[in-house]
Amino acid sequence: MLKLLLGDPNARKLKRYQPIVTDINILEEDIALLSDDQLRSKTADFRQQFENVVSFAKQRALLDELLPEAFAVVREAAKRVLGMRHFDVQLIGGMVLHEGQIGEMKTGEGKTLVATLPSYLNALTGRGVHVVTVNDYLARRDAEWMGQVHRFLGLSVGLIQQDMSPAERRRNYACDITYATNSELGFDYLRDNMATDLSEVVQREFQYCVIDEVDSILIDEARTPLIISGQVERPQEKYQQAADVAAALERAAEQGKDGIDPEGDYEVDEKQRSCTLTDEGFAKAEQNLRVRDLFDPADPWAHYITNALKAKELFVRDVNYIVRDGEAVIVDEFTGRVMPGRRWSDGQHQAIEAKEQLAIQPETQTLASITYQNFFLLYPRLAGMTGTAKTEEVEFEKTYKLETSVIPTNQPRARADWVDQVYKTESAKWRAVANETAEIHKQGRPVLVGTTSVEKSELLSSLLSEQEIPHNLLNAKPENVEREAEIVAQAGRAGAVTIATNMAGRGTDIILGGNSDYMARLKLREVLLPRLVRPEEGHRPPVPLQRAAETGGGFAAKAAASNGSHGHVLSEARAIGSLYPCSLTDDTDQFLAELARELVKVWGDRALSVIELEDRISTAAEKAPTDDAQIAALRESIARVKTEYDVVVTQEEVRVREAGGLHVIGTERHESRRVDNQLRGRAGRQGDLGSTRFFLSLEDNLLRIFGGERVASLMNAFRVEEDMPIESGMLTRSLEGAQKKVETYYYDIRKQVFEYDEVMNNQRRAVYAERRRVLEGRGLKKQVIGYGERTMDDIVEAYVNPDLPPEEWDLGQLVSKVQQFVYLLEDLKPEQLQGLSMEELKSFLQEQLRNAYDIKEGQIEQQRPGLMREAERFFILQQIDTLWREHLQAMDALRESVGLRGYGQKDPLIEYKNEGYDMFLEMMANMRRNVIYSMFMFQPAASGQEQA
């Protein structure tokens, strides 16, 4: 009703952009008249305007002002370089992204092209722009493909890949626009904040970020934090000795009261899940271990004994854990399921292994961690695009403060979504899928089948092989992943059948009739690879499924036979056949052979790596100007091959359209409606014809867990045959309800992860900011003296009670504590402090500390000028890193323990916040004290070598 009265809010929002679109369209004519050089010089003109604008707010205002002209420039560059012109709706998409929102754009509407607009505009500030994708392949593809537009306009384009060295990373992050995956960005951020020298830092300050497939990164991946951990070298035999000591100690029958120890060696508090040694227990343990002090820092035992006691009393075999195959496996207390691979932290798991006489595995310790939620919130402006965001609108708004706008499609949608078919058993469902695939394949239409697991995709593959239907398999198996792009590029050809597991198939569009541009590049690769690439790489070049030219289009049936019963890897024999739509003319074959000979002369005989060859072919496939004669020759040959292929591909495209376009089959409902919509969105791109259908069975997970019995009893009542499908509105509605339930459940988990990490995040930012200041070496001396002054204040506050008269203050104790930290003040006498007020005491001691520090600096600088600054930096970083690591563990332990406080009517999150804050203040105070102590104790070796 409200919608009728007020109109669609999304439409109202988009209306705002219309006048700007008109401005860009008016500018288009003038900009089209510019030469390439004049168009390129626009970038320098824009950049000049930012020279004296420093503040973020002013830069943003200037960007908004430049937007119409900058967008018009990018549109013209894309026309010249890629032969693609941004539609009006894509300009609106660009504006939505520039404003830091999420744009929902349907599959095939050119999301990747849209991203060029805001990334060019925001790169003009010189602060750098990050474009984030879900995997390395897509990052590389986009950097090569869309990067052409930016390079043509004079911007530098960087790419981050998994195996890059720090120097390469730094160079790529320094570019105007950098393409990377979410995990590479996150891990680089964590590594930068563990660097011990500024030269190791690879990233710049964050400015603007566009995330492709934003739902996948900010929602699906949000539950798992990024963690860098290191193995901790701890003596294994200590665990065993501690377990033996714990076994010999006796538990107290009751807990001590009013500070008086009970009878026995240790007491157990089951509520707090803790064990504490009594004085008697300490003596016994020290005697058994033949040590003088369990807390001796040189040989600490207390931690091991406490863990051994907890393993003995609080961790019960077959309740908290089971022993299986020589390992202690945790049992989840909520579900009762075992959790292989999971381990208790902080040495507790090792204590249990010692108790059970199992092999003790090394401890790991978290060195740094962050969630994607908090990582991406570090960007002052964040934007994202996806085909499906509306179902998660609330979460984007609440967690990330991101609005969602639905961008209209350029052409009206012509896809038909057929009704779901539900079968009684899974085997009946798979037979039905194979039959429908065969039926549609015979009509000459391409079919894409989405499966949920590798196992299921191979089951369907064998069913299709029985019917002799040639098909392509695309799942997480390594041999198939390599060919992902090639397979998807061919999935739109007449009669093509592609089985894809849901991990796959993002990023490459399915073009009806096939992608002639891609086939031409593949042909070139096939011709050049044996001549130019080093054979010892052991890299079997992926070559897509072949077709026989004489069939004039449809896949050759012989392909099925060699696919084997499970459609695994293509046989080597067929791998160099002809996947291509037609054979090339003799002239072109001759031309390619000649090209290969020429390239061998210049680039060497089999001297390149596969990646280098691919990069050169990709560069040749661009339209950007080049002075390189070899790249120009490659470009000419790609164009020549493409022209020949186009003749067949265009005819095939017409045939496929007439037959009804791509048909997409879903074989199971996913936990999230969003993933189902992504699969459907593969058909009917850009107004193409197409159809989709989901096949389900009562044995599918979602139906089984949420209300399958009710439906099963209905089917039994109606005596439905196994092979008879049900099409029912009630069923579809209850499925959607089930999906909503699952989505809400996962949202709550993510929300909780976020709320707890939010507490850590504020602490993380403070620690990392302090660390960065030290790395950059800004005012180190002032910082250390500041630490010292605060330490003096802490000592005064600890030893002086303002409520007592000054003559009762224990100044002797206070002075000896100060001398512990600053041995240079050994002449300080308690008498010098008499008669001073508390504030005067603080000022006097701070003054003494500053003088002592100057003396220390004089001594150290005599050894080698600059050594004092190096020492300051070393000690601060060492202390921050050590204490932060310990703090991370303590916060983990706190998080586990606060959960129980819900029983005491306390909010665990508030308890976590308050205690976490106190622990953080304590950590920072320890860091200051340790640094001051280390600086005064620092004695460089005579050679001038630093001894840490």
Swiss-Prot record:
Primary subcellular site in the record, as a coarse category: membrane
Coiled-coil spans in chain: none
GO biological process per UniProt: intracellular protein transmembrane transport; protein import; protein targeting; protein transport by the Sec complex
Gene3D superfamilies per record: Helical scaffold and wing domains of SecA (1.10.3060.10), P-loop containing nucleotide triphosphate hydrolases (3.40.50.300), SecA, preprotein cross-linking domain (3.90.1440.10)
Keyword annotations: ATP-binding, Cell inner membrane, Cell membrane, Cytoplasm, Membrane, Nucleotide-binding, Protein transport, Thylakoid, Translocase, Translocation, Transport
Catalytic function, reaction form: ATP + H2O + cellular proteinSide 1 = ADP + phosphate + cellular proteinSide 2
GO cellular component: cell envelope Sec protein transport complex; cytosol; plasma membrane-derived thylakoid membrane
MF term (GO), any: ATP binding
Protein topology in the membrane: Peripheral membrane protein
Subcellular location, record wording: Cell inner membrane; Cellular thylakoid membrane; Cytoplasm
SMART domains registered for this protein in UniProt: SecA_DEAD (SM00957), SecA_PP_bind (SM00958)
One Pfam family, short name: SecA_SW
UniProt keyword Translocase, yes or no: yes
EC number(s) from the headed UniProt entry: 7.4.2.8
Amino-acid positions noted as binding ATP in the UniProt annotation, renumbered to this chain: 90, 108-112, 509
Job description of the protein: Part of the Sec protein translocase complex. Interacts with the SecYEG preprotein conducting channel. Has a central role in coupling the hydrolysis of ATP to the transfer of proteins into and across the cell membrane, serving as an ATP-driven molecular motor driving the stepwise translocation of polypeptide chains across the membrane.
Homology family: Belongs to the SecA family.
HAMAP family linked: SecA (MF_01382)
Subunit description: Monomer and homodimer. Part of the essential Sec protein translocation apparatus which comprises SecA, SecYEG and auxiliary proteins SecDF. Other proteins may also be involved.
Protein name, entry field: Protein translocase subunit SecA
Source taxonomy: Bacteria, Bacillati, Cyanobacteriota, Cyanophyceae, Synechococcales
